[in-house]
């Protein structure tokens, strides 16, 4: 079963998602826009273990906290080459 959590982050209200596999509690963070602390809170509340960050595209409002979140969890970032 998959669960989806979301937060609206940053100056332009970008949607950041946490996709959680409830069978193993692993998750993927999508578009960590801003406010790493808010992302960490969302992860803690879900009880999940992030496995990766997925960027839908490279605009500033979708990647603002990507490196900090990557370093915090020791996970990789995946993005399209476009």
Q: Can you say where each PLM-predicted feature lies in the sequence?
A:
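Active-site HxH/HxHxD metal-binding segment of metal-dependent hydrolases
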Residues: 35-82
């Amino acid at each position: 079963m998959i669960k989806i959590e979301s937060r609206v982050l940053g100056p332009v209200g970008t949607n950041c998602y946490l996709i959680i596999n409830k069978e193993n509690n692993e998750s993927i963070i999508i578009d960590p826009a801003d406010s790493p602390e808010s992302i960490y809170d969302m992860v803690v509340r879900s009880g999940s273990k992030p496995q990766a960050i997925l960027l839908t595209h490279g605009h500033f409002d979708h990647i603002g906290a990507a490196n900090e979140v990557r370093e915090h969890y020791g996970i990789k970032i995946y993005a399209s080459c476009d």
